[in-house]
């Protein structure tokens, strides 16, 4: 939302239950991002979850490239499934994960598990 209430120790104005989840995210060593593949990318629910990670940032004293926030260092993994097995099936979802989670947020990639259900046809 960008209101910055969380950055000043105030309660979040977004009442979606994520505030209760924040201590668990901060305490976790590994965060597994799991989603069905929908329209060639992660689900809207997972994307909304990732976007809420803004509230776990802290001010960076020496910001690279003008970014003033820094995220805690965490390990991350991606778990996905889809109904087809084309070579490009996961391309957009993997790109989103690598750019957003690994490069922008700065989590350490611990791997991806992608499985198609083509054998069930």
Where are each of the predicted segments found?
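Helix-loop-strand module that forms the ligand-binding subsite of alpha/beta enzymes
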Residues: 11-97
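Local cysteine-cluster metal-coordination motifs and their immediate loop/turn environment
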Residues: 1-11
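Glycine-rich phosphate/pyrophosphate-binding loop and the adjoining helix
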Residues: 87-121
């Amino acid at each position: 939302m960008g209101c910055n209430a969380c950055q000043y120790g105030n309660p979040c104005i977004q009442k979606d239950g994520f505030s209760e989840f924040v201590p668990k995210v901060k305490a976790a060593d590994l965060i597994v991002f799991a989603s069905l593949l929908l329209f060639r990318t992660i689900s809207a629910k997972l994307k909304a979850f990732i976007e809420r990670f803004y509230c776990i940032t802290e001010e960076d004293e020496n910001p690279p490239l003008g970014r003033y926030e820094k995220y805690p260092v965490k390990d991350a993994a991606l778990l996905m499934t889809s109904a087809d097995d084309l070579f490009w099936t996961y391309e957009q979802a993997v790109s989103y994960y690598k750019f957003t989670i690994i490069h922008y947020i700065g989590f350490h990639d611990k791997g991806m598990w992608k499985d198609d259900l083509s054998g069930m046809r």
